[in-house]
UniProtKB/Swiss-Prot annotation:
SUPFAM superfamilies: Cytochrome P450. It comes from Callithrix jacchus (White-tufted-ear marmoset). PROSITE patterns: CYTOCHROME_P450. GO terms for biological process: arachidonate metabolic process; xenobiotic metabolic process. This is Cytochrome P450 2D19. Belongs to the cytochrome P450 family. Heme binds at C443.
């Protein structure tokens, strides 16, 4: 094809792209549509957002456009919600209309389909409701909120403390041990298994989980979701979500092994067996969400989300204890007064430990590990804070803007446990405390996370005093964003009390 022939083709393509772009811009001209930066033809606002630090970009845009502003990612309309009032109005008051998830085209490479969408990214509909009900009821049957699961967590905390003690007061990074301990709690619920901390299968799952987290952020992911036709470029699809694919493959081996020990005649011992029992009941029903593909996705969701968020929060907790030794000493004094140094902590102790409870909540608020939550999508036209948001709009909820809003917190950018204490020293929880999001899609693992955070944290502070290693600089209190916010790498010394 000669150069003369290419020119008309290029002009035609350019006109087509501009027409499509204009068609997607029409809603920006509607009355009361949220303001936002002017999108570029074809790209929209992809270049206006730093996807390596999305929360910071959103906070800058908030200062310019207000609590409710709009973006256009290629041709995908997006509205970002900031502040308690806007987030609560959208997720709670209009919860039924904002409970959907936007399509994520690249997840098709992980086995997503109409009846296999897992839990967290599933579209709001019968399949999601079925799996949400199943997961909540099964976790409750397996001991969530009961003494049996509490004892399992406390037993794992004993193993964790022993692993800390092995370092004999020498400097080490606690993250890996925290990952392993929390993973064992999830493994016990999903496949009735406890891993030794040096088990190759566990180490492989943890490595792939952390690598998979990095694949949840970045410009390439957003571009491919906004322009999925690019996935047809030869070789590109194979390079996307490599770690998440490998994680599912490793998990498949674990589930296949566990499946061989399942006895359908016996009551389910874990979530996997309960899922297999439901598969037997719904066999022959093509509309059921109980199928092999969804088993892997549901277990993967529970394992990765349940492990990572709690483990990272505990890592933040220990970091903040070595940065604030006065707070650490006060927590330990309360532990000594209520529990002592011999008896294991129990959930019943929490009622009598307002300061420790306040510290754990302040760790969650300050760490702000899921700053943007998970995206939502409107299922009908709605109004939020006086702005009209059309059906099919992707919603980002800037939870960071709620957890660190100067209108709701006395010292939003400082670690200050008194945020959760009244004048009499009693624990209080402000309504702006939303680390688990809110509404119909709020984190279903919140009760488990609360139990793990209290029991692991108090067990560690009961047994050890933590400090910055001698000769090392003071660790940074600033986190690193990669969908979740993790502490900057640090070491500590754990000295037996």
């Amino acid at each position: 094809m000669g150069l003369d022939a290419l020119v008309p083709l290029a002009v035609t393509v350019a006109i087509f792209v501009l027409l499509v772009d204009l068609m997607h811009r029409r809603q920006r001209w509607a009355a009361r549509y949220p303001p936002g930066p002017m999108p570029l033809p074809g790209l929209g606002n992809l270049l206006h957002v730093d996807f390596q630090n999305t929360p910071n970009s959103f906070n800058q845009l908030r200062r310019r456009f207000g609590d409710v502003f709009s973006l256009q990612l290629a041709w995908t309309p997006v509205v970002v919600l900031n502040g308690l009032e806007a987030v609560r109005e959208a997720l709670v008051t209009r919860g039924e209309d904002t409970a959907d998830r936007p399509p994520v085209p690249i997840t098709e490479m992980l086995g997503f389909g109409p009846h296999s969408q897992g839990l967290f990214l599933a579209r709001y509909g019968p399949a999601w409701r079925e799996q949400r009900r199943f997961s909540v009821s099964t976790l409750r049957n397996l001991g969530l909120g009961k003494k049996s699961l509490e004892q399992w967590v406390t037993e794992e905390a004993t193993y964790l403390c022993a692993a800390f003690a092995d370092h004999a007061g020498r400097p080490f990074r606690p993250n890996g041990l925290l990952d392993k301990a929390v993973s064992n709690v999830i493994a016990s619920l999903t496949c009735r298994r406890r891993f030794e901390y040096n088990d190759p299968c566990l180490l492989r799952l943890l490595d792939l989980t952390m690598e998979g987290l990095k694949e949840e952020s970045g410009l390439l992911r957003e571009v491919l979701n906004a322009i999925p036709v690019l996935l047809r470029i030869p070789g590109l699809a194979g390079k996307v979500l490599r770690s998440q694919k490998a994680f599912l493959a490793q998990l498949d081996e674990l589930l296949t092994e566990h499946r061989m020990t399942w006895d359908p005649a016996q009551p389910p011992r874990d979530l996997t067996e309960a899922f297999l029992a439901e598969m037997e009941k719904t066999k022959g029903n093509p509309e059921s969400s109980f199928n092999d593909e969804n088993l892997h996705l549901v277990v993967a969701d529970l394992f990765s989300a349940g492990m990572v968020t709690t483990s990272i929060t505990l890592a933040w907790g220990l970091l903040l204890m070595i940065l604030h030794p006065d707070v650490q000493r006060r927590v330990q004094q309360e532990i000594d007064d209520v529990i002592g140094r011999v008896r294991r902590p129990e959930m019943g102790d929490q009622t009598y430990m307002p300061y420790t409870t306040a510290v754990i909540h302040e760790v969650q608020r300050f760490a702000d590990i899921v700053p943007l939550g998970v995206t939502h999508m409107t299922s009908r036209d709605i109004e939020v804070q006086g702005f009209l948001i059309p059906k099919g709009t992707t919603l980002f909820t800037n939870l960071s803007s709620v957890l660190k809003d100067e209108a709701n917190w006395e010292k939003p950018f400082r670690f200050h446990p008194e945020h959760f204490l009244d004048a009499q020293g009693r624990f209080v929880k402000p309504e702006a405390f939303l680390p688990f999001s809110a509404g119909r899609r709020a984190c279903l693992g919140e009760p488990l996370a609360r139990m793990e955070l209290f029991l692991f944290f108090t067990c560690l502070l009961q047994r050890f005093s933590f400090s910055v290693p001698a000769g090392q600089p003071r660790p940074s209190p600033h986190g690193v964003f990669a969908f979740l916010v993790t502490p900057s790498p640090y070491e500590l010394c754990a000295v037996p009390r």
